Amino acid sequence: MRKVLVFLKNSKKAFETFKRVERVLKDLNLSYKKFINRKELFKVLKPKDYELFLVIGGDGTFLSAARIASRFGVPLVGVNEGRFGFLTEIKKEEIKKVLPLVLEGRAKLQERLMIDVYLRSRNRLRYLGNYLNDAVISKSSIARIIRTKVFINGEEVLEVFGDGVILSTPTGSTAYALSAGGPIVYPESQNLLFVPICPHTLSNRPLVLPSKFEVKFKVVSENMEAFLTLDGQEGFHLKKGDEVIVKRSRYVCRMYSHPRKSFFGILKEKLRWG
């Protein structure tokens, strides 16, 4: 591995952590380039420019980088400089010992499923992008329930009365979907996860689906505005009749897992699981 792109959060702590990372890169004689601005990165990056995206920040920074790196098939590894760090698995205290193992190719390379999201509004279909975690339709600031029809492979399967709905990837199953009562899905599984948010009907339960299925949500609430949030970072206002279509993306997120920790170990450490 010879060319590394360092993508970091715009914060003082992230810059301090970068100094530690920089020393490791220099010790291994690796060339690197540092980026902070996502838009700038998208403009200058070309396929196969780099062999690794090294992300310094929290899970939000990692999700943002994943949408870019997946387009070029470049693997990522995350160094945590946020509050939680479920995706940015390497702690800053571990940089000197653990990061070289990744850079030398001694860590496991995973392929994580991503989703493509489309919005149909006023008979116009628009592609919104590819995402690693989830698509969430939720109510606006007014404290009323919203009605959302759910279609799976073209068949209307239910109508949810509640605070909204989540369509998650296995990676996203430990994010908002988990808080809403969904199951934890092993991150390399090939599934989609549907989770209703605070449904007003006891029979509306989470559902695990094959990744080849297409899921469509239609907002049917009268005079109620809903909101679509993608990976917790991009948002769109929705009105009655708008449809959100989610399907498996042709892009995948390639990422190195922590060479000394398993997924279950991270669950125990981060979520106190087990």
UniProtKB/Swiss-Prot annotation:
Location of this chain's protein in the cell: Cytoplasm
Residues annotated as catalytic: D59 (proton acceptor)
Record's GO cellular component terms: cytoplasm
Keywords assigned: ATP-binding, Cytoplasm, Kinase, NAD, NADP, Nucleotide-binding, Transferase
GO biological process, one term: NAD metabolic process
Needed co-factor(s): a divalent metal cation
Catalyzed reactions: NAD(+) + ATP = ADP + NADP(+) + H(+)
Keyword Ligase: no
MF term (GO), any: ATP binding
E.C. designation(s): 2.7.1.23
InterPro entries: ATP-NAD_kinase_N, ATP-NAD_kinase_PpnK-typ_C, NAD/diacylglycerol_kinase_sf, NADK
Residues at which NAD(+) binds: D59, G60, N133, D134, R144, D163, T174, A175, Y176, A177, L178, S179, Q233
Pfam families xref list: NAD_kinase, NAD_kinase_C
Top-level lineage group: Bacteria
Entry similarity comment: Belongs to the NAD kinase family.
Function, as annotated: Involved in the regulation of the intracellular balance of NAD and NADP, and is a key enzyme in the biosynthesis of NADP. Catalyzes specifically the phosphorylation on 2'-hydroxyl of the adenosine moiety of NAD to yield NADP.
Entry protein name: NAD kinase
Organism: Aquifex aeolicus (strain VF5)
Organism phylogeny: Bacteria, Pseudomonadati, Aquificota, Aquificia, Aquificales
Gene behind this protein: nadK
